Structure formats: structure tokens, C-alpha cells
């Protein structure tokens, strides 16, 4: 399913000057090849020799049109935010920008890290992820992000909000509106939506911020399914990539792990909860994760217009 009309052959026959300016000075390009798979972009690997003869590799993602510019900016700022907190946990982001020679074509550039296809060790992965969540500090003290980020090719709600319940409700509403735009509304959906916003969300999220409790706005990856994580082939340490960040309740991250098709099983949540205390009230933990899953599932249903099973599952 392709949503980007960038011609990879045209883009990789030579390096656009805008990309070249972001590579190390006086480096020599030795190869450019397609690398990786994306529904929304063209991706490639650039191999160079530095001026001292040292080999180095870079990953480039290329998108087109105005939405492509917004997506590359969102990813660059997301990866930069994670890298600032835990530089060992993500490939180093280098730049985002617009091609000089191909109209309306935009890129995201980062260091290339060779990765294995194995799932990361739960304890090692939980250690890295917990550092992102715990060490990060919202610049406003609120939930949200300073720039729109995209899960797939659809925007996420990122406006700054004081309350996590308020932020999540607005985020859920935006995802639902996007889904209804492409798959239509129904009387049943109207009834379910009313119950969701008037009863379910307040029931599960209001207690987090009641009776003296507070929720720390934590930097989250935003789309942390197993295809956006790997193991560095050289260091054997876990890595995450393809982020679409915002500051959220840390447990929101795990809503993406609930579907059976996801390879982040219960052992990863168990490992994480050894390091980070479950938010009170703990008895609502499973219910909160199911609610967060609904937000992810709704967004995914909006992304894949022709798949009606995503709405009914």
C-alpha cells in the first residue's frame, strides 16, 4: 500500500545537494542502496568514506508533498528528543530538510545502525525504555509536543494540556474523527462513542489525577510496535526508531503492545514494571492499557482505509 510518489531511482542516482550538505565534510560516497520497508516513504542507505578513510553509513527517508515535509520534521524532532535523553537507545538523528533539485521532496537523515531481526531482551529493553520515560522532562510541564508528529501518514494530537485525562480524550477524539472520515459513522458507533467519552475515559483516567495523585508527562516513542525496535548488530543492545513522540502517561506506550499480533508480550511489561511503579490505582492498570489500545487501534483503522476488519476486531 503506497502513499508516496517519490521515485527512489531518481532520488538515489545521485545525492541531492541538500542531503550532501548534511554528510561529513569531504567524505566520499561509496554506495547508495534502497534499504528497509515503509508504507509511507522511500528509504535507503548511504555508505561513505570519511576524509581519514573510515567507513560510515547513514539512513535516509524520503517523502513528498507538504505532508512529507511535516512527517520528516516530526520524526527528526521525535528522534532528537529521545536521543537527548538516552543517546544509546536510538540511531543519532542528523537532519531533516528539502531537496534542492527535486521539487516538493523532503528527507530525514540519521546514522545507520545494522540490526538483527531478533526481539530484544525484555530486561535490557525495559531498562532503555524506562530511562526515556523517567529521565525526560516536558519543557512546559504539560502533556503534548512542540511540533505535530505522525503515526503513519496521519497526524497525532499534540496540543499542550495540563491534564492527562483531557489530553487523552482530545487525542482519542481526533483519532476517531479521522477514522469516521474514511469509514463512515453509524448509530451504533455514536452510542459507543458517547459512552467512551462520558463514562469510560473519566472512570479510568480521572483517578490518576485525583486524591492528590499526579501523572508525570513522560516522553513516549508513540508507535512502539515490534517493527520499530531491534538489536544493534555490533553492540547487541536494543534500539528504537521511527518515533512519533509526545509527552504522555508512560503507560500509554503499552497500548500498542496489547494486540496479539504484536511481539512485545507480557514479559516486556513485567520487566518494565520491575523498574517503574504501576500508576495508582493499580487495580485499573489493565483497564487503562485496554483504553490506550483503543486509541492505537482507532488510528490504525483510519490509516488502512480498505481494511474493515480493523474497525470490528
Q: PLM features: what roles do these ranges have?
A:
Residues 34-166, 170:
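ATP-binding pocket architecture of kinase catalytic cores
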Residues 1-32:
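Juxta-kinase regulatory segment immediately upstream of eukaryotic protein kinase catalytic domains
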Residues 12-13, 76, 266-269:
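Short, surface-exposed alpha-helical segments at coil->helix boundaries
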Residues 24-31, 186-193, 277-286:
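Short, surface-exposed acidic
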Residues 291-303:
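Short helix/strand-capping connector loops at secondary-structure junctions
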Residues 160-169, 173, 177-178, 214-219, ...:
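Active-site Asp-x-Gly
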Residues 300-313:
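ATP/Mg2+ or Mg2+-diphosphate-binding catalytic cores
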Residues 14-23, 98-102, 137-221, 232-235:
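An alpha-helical support segment within catalytic cores of ATP-dependent transferases
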Amino acid at each position: 500500500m503506497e502513499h508516496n510518489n517519490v521515485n527512489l531511482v531518481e532520488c538515489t542516482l545521485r545525492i541531492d545537494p541538500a542531503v550532501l550538505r548534511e554528510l561529513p565534510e569531504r567524505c566520499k560516497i561509496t554506495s547508495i542502496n534502497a534499504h528497509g520497508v515503509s508504507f509511507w516513504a522511500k528509504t535507503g542507505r548511504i555508505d561513505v568514506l570519511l576524509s581519514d578513510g573510515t567507513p560510515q553509513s547513514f539512513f535516509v527517508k524520503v517523502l513528498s508533498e507538504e505532508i512529507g515535509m511535516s512527517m520528516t520534521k516530526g520524526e527528526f524532532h521525535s528522534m532528537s528528543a529521545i536521543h537527548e535523553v538516552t543517546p544509546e537507545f536510538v540511531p543519532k538523528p542528523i537532519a531533516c530538510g528539502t531537496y534542492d533539485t527535486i521539487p516538493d521532496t523532503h528527507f530525514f537523515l540519521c546514522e545507520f545502525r545494522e540490526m538483527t531481526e531478533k526481539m530484544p531482551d525484555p530486561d535490557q529493553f525495559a531498562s532503555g525504555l524506562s530511562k526515556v520515560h523517567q529521565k525526560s522532562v516536558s519543557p512546559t510541564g504539560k502533556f503534548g509536543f512542540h511540533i505535530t508528529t505522525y503515526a503513519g501518514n496521519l497526524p497525532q494530537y499534540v496540543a499542550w494540556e495540563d491534564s492527562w485525562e483531557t489530553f487523552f480524550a482530545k487525542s482519542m477524539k481526533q483519532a476517531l474523527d479521522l477514522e469516521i472520515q474514511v469509514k463512515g459513522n453509524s448509530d451504533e458507533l455514536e452510542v459507543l462513542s458517547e459512552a467512551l467519552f462520558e463514562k469510560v475515559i473519566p472512570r479510568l483516567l480521572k483517578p490518576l489525577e485525583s486524591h492528590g495523585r499526579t501523572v508525570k508527562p513522560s516522553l513516549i516513542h508513540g508507535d512502539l510496535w515490534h517493527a520499530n525496535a531491534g538489536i544493534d548488530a555490533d553492540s547487541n543492545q536494543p534500539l528504537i526508531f521511527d518515533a512519533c513522540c509526545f509527552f504522555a502517561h508512560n503507560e500509554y506506550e503499552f497500548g500498542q503492545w496489547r494486540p496479539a499480533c504484536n511481539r512485545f508480550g507480557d514479559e516486556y511489561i513485567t520487566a518494565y514494571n520491575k523498574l517503574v511503579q504501576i500508576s495508582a490505582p493499580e487495580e485499573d492498570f489493565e483497564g487503562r492499557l485496554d483504553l490506550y489500545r483503543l486509541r492505537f487501534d482507532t488510528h490504525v483503522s483510519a490509516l488502512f482505509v480498505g481494511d474493515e476488519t480493523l474497525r470490528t476486531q
